[in-house]
Amino acid sequence: MLLPLFHQQPLILAKTFPDRIFPPFLVPNTLVSRRNVSRANSGIFCSSASGRKTLPQSAIQRIAEKLRSLGFVEEKHDSPTRRITGEESGKNSPGEIFVPLPKQLPIHRVGHTIDTSWSTPSYPVPKPGSGTAISRYHELKRVWKKETEMERKKEEKVPSLAELTLPPAELRRLRTVGIRLTKKLKIGKAGITEGIVNGIHERWRTTEVVKIFCEDISRMNMKRTHDVLETKTGGLVIWRSGSKILLYRGVNYQYPYFVSDRDLAHEAASGASSMDQGVVDSREKQSIAESSAPSITNKMVKPMLTQGVGSPDKVRFQLPGEVQLVEEADRLLEGLGPRFTDWWAYDPLPVDGDLLPAVVPDYRRPFRLLPYGVSPKLTDDEMTTIRRLGRPLPCHFALGRNRNLQGLAVAIVKLWEKCELAKIAVKRGVQNTNSELMAEELKWLTGGTLISRDKDFIVLYRGKDFLPSAVSSAIEERRRQTMIMENSSVHGNKLTENEEEIKPRAVKEDIELEAKDQKDHIQTHQMKSRQRNSPEAILEKTSMKLSMALEKKANAEKVLADLENRESPQLSDIDKEGITNDEKYMLRKIGLKMKPFLLLGRRGVFDGTIENMHLHWKYRELVKIICNEYSIEAAHKVAEILEAESGGILVAVEMVSKGYAIIVYRGKNYERPQCLRPQTLLSKREALKRSVEAQRRKSLKLHVLKLSNNIEELNRQLVEDSATNETWSDGESSNMMVEEETENQHTEPEKAREKIELGYSSDLSVPSSGEENWEDDSEGEVDPLTTSSQEYQEDESESASSQRHEGNSLDSTANLSVFAETGSANASSFHDRSLPHNSFLNANRKLPGSSTGSGSQISALRERKSENDGLVTDLSNRERLILRKQALKMKKRPPFAVGRSNVVTGLARTLKMHFQKNPLAIVNVKGRANGTSVQEVIAKLKEETGALLVSQEPSKVILYRGWGAEEEMKSFYPNNNVKSSINLPSTRSFVDDPPHVSPALIEAIRLECGL
């Protein structure tokens, strides 16, 4: 079937086109109708209004025209007609995808894409890479490369032992063989042990090169590992890179191990290799025979054999390098003591610790001094590293006893001057050896650090603060000289003969000059310290602190005032939406159950708080805000501010476990404002600044109050010191008067007795009629005292009357003058054990010639008055029951207990501090000493604390301070009728009734108001 022209499939075009794309035989003229041509011609002239170009007649022609515009050139052939061969038809067959090769794609460099049409001779476009900067860069780079190569050539690498002994070709061959090896030998934490050496020799029996991989401590110093491998094995390191080593066995290598038994026929018959059979030569047999034969030299010199691994009879001769290592280890032990001859391990022989002296006269622990900035303890990494270093070390000492190791301690300290670690082996076969006791004894005697300990070995580290004996002795000598010169300069004494002998003669004059300068320095230092510690200096310093605190407080108040001026909170809207009580009840109930809430922190209310409220109101009608205020009134103030600024309706302010919950309703006609953050409130940063400044002002107020109290106390102390100095000068004259009175007492004892007993005549005789009125006046002061207090005073009066006849007249005169000054009010409540009860009555009388005592005596007597003031009474059974219930309901009980020693001084001090905040205390008496009754412990506690016994349980007692439980006890009494006996803080407490407002706050208010 023939298709029209526009239905024919186009051919795959090559890059070049012939002159005529469509041969005349492909398109028959009979099939082209005029109708189609006219339609085609009409389609040809259709074009856009802007172009007005004549389009090609077909799509193929348009594609060809596009390819010509892209740079493809047509190939011109001589023959007008060309037949397509089979190859070309195969290449350009219909349906084949044309994939261009890289050679067929045009290469466009970046430099050649620049349009050169605007280039002129005066301003030519530079070629890519021909600029001055890039040319200079390439030139400098070439110079740098040449210099680097020259330096590399100048550095002559030191050749290794393998490079010096082996030819280069053989060395390259061995390195190639070693690098291709897949099996490798790992050197672990223990280092190059005999097992590693044995493994290397076993591999050398089959291969001439062994690849070794170092780990842990061995890789930290590869040069050291390199040398140790060559020393212990006798091989050559032919290549080393990182932690890998290629070890060559050598040219004339022989397997070094042999069996120490004389009968070698069994080994020969066991089918060993020829190499193994040729190892044991005549020289080795002779050495074995000589070592086994008994001789004097063999007893003195041990054969240099090293036991192998895997068989007890397998040994080898030590290499020269190994002998050198043993000699170095043996050199460390020279001069430390006798050797342990029955040593079972490798050389060198350790020192026998049992042969060292058990007790060294005048032994002292070594002096230590830690460098500045160094931590005394070892870190975990340091401990691990030192422990790993101590494992391959040879043993320095062998020990079999547990105690009396002073001689061994001296030897260890000497060893520490050469080696940081000391390794002690525990002797085998010795009875009752305990490595733990040994380690503790040595650690205490030497002051070192225990690194590791087991049943066989003990490793001790000398520590970071270790000093050699020469350095420590020099430091101790210098300190001793300094102490001697300080003592001589302070006390002004001359040095003794022994101390003179201590000082070296060469530096005697220098020490004297230094001592003189030090004496002057000490005197000036003492003078300055006295001036600093004087009350005047302390008062001046405190005044300066007070002025600085006041200045800081003023600055804080100024900043707070500025922040308050910036904030202008809005007033609540008068005409706002209201809600009914039922709605408020339901909203409150829903709000308290809400899980999402806003937390109000230390910043308080600021613009971000209101923004968060509006964001909450976007999804819910209520918002719950938690604030940590101290009172419900403060929470209500915060709620009012939130209500006014947000425009919501305050529902409730309730107390919850986290603080106070403020619930705000957005309202039924809520509209979200355009600006969520109100401009009348502070920002987040300003709110934090306000909180910090308020806290600073509060702390400065208390600091100012404390400093002002200190200044008042210092002023009072200065006045008392001046008064004491005056009374001290008057005391000398009074002592003269006392001496005269004592002389008169010898001559006129009866008159002196009458003068002494002037104030106590009421105790010995019945009062006369002239004294009845005075007794009636004083009767009102004696009546309030209870019966127990009267008995106490009678006992005291008896003891005082017995001392009165033996006392001095001056003491009685001073006591009378003191009581004359204090007055009757203080005398009624003052119970001094040094005076009888009736002396208070006589003290109220105005005695002629009575002089007032000094201020220090009055203050001392007042302190004794405060100690003995307030004799407590017992509680009723009902009060005890109520207080017991209240004590047992306490949730947080402080752990008070009486110990085995029955000393209650510290417990009483703690109870007094506890009673300042809590009215009740529970004391556990179960742990008291055996044979001590509970009543005795209770009596001690009551005497020390002044508390009341509420209840005595089987293992505990309940104490009451005497006041503070009235509010709680009201719930137990009907009609809130609390007995008057509970409300007697003046007679039942050893501490004043605490006010509702703290004293510090009251003093701060007084200071602020200028009162």
UniProtKB/Swiss-Prot annotation:
Gene3D superfamilies: YhbY-like
GO BP of this protein: Group I intron splicing; Group II intron splicing; mRNA processing
Subcellular location field: Plastid, Chloroplast stroma
Region described as Disordered: 77-96, 721-810, 841-872
Presequence extent in this chain: 1-45
GO molecular function ontology, one term from the record: mRNA binding
Comp. bias regions, Polar residues: 722-736, 762-771, 849-859
Keywords, comma-separated and alphabetical: Chloroplast, mRNA processing, mRNA splicing, Plastid, Repeat, Ribonucleoprotein, RNA-binding, Transit peptide
Domain CRM: 164-260, 376-473, 577-677, 873-972
InterPro entries: CRS1/CFM2/CFM3 (IPR045278), RNA-binding_CRM (IPR001890), YhbY-like_sf (IPR035920)
The protein's name in its UniProt record: CRM-domain containing factor CFM2, chloroplastic
Gene knockout outcome: Albino seeds that germinate poorly and die soon after germination.
Biased composition (Acidic residues): 772-782
Taxonomic source organism: Arabidopsis thaliana (Mouse-ear cress)
Function: Binds specific group II introns in chloroplasts and facilitates their splicing. Acts on both subgroup IIA and subgroup IIB introns. The substrates of the subgroup IIB also require the CRM domain proteins CAF1 or CAF2, with a simultaneous binding of CFM2 and CAF1 or CAF2. Can bind to and promote the splicing of the single group I intron in chloroplast tRNA transcript of trnL-UAA gene.
GO cellular component: chloroplast; chloroplast stroma; plastid stroma; ribonucleoprotein complex
Pfam families linked: CRS1_YhbY
Compositionally biased intervals (Basic and acidic residues): 77-90, 743-757
Source lineage: Eukaryota, Viridiplantae, Streptophyta, Embryophyta, Tracheophyta
Self-association and partners: Interacts with RNA. Part of large ribonucleo-protein particles that contain CAF1 and/or CAF2.
Top-level taxon of the source organism: Eukaryota
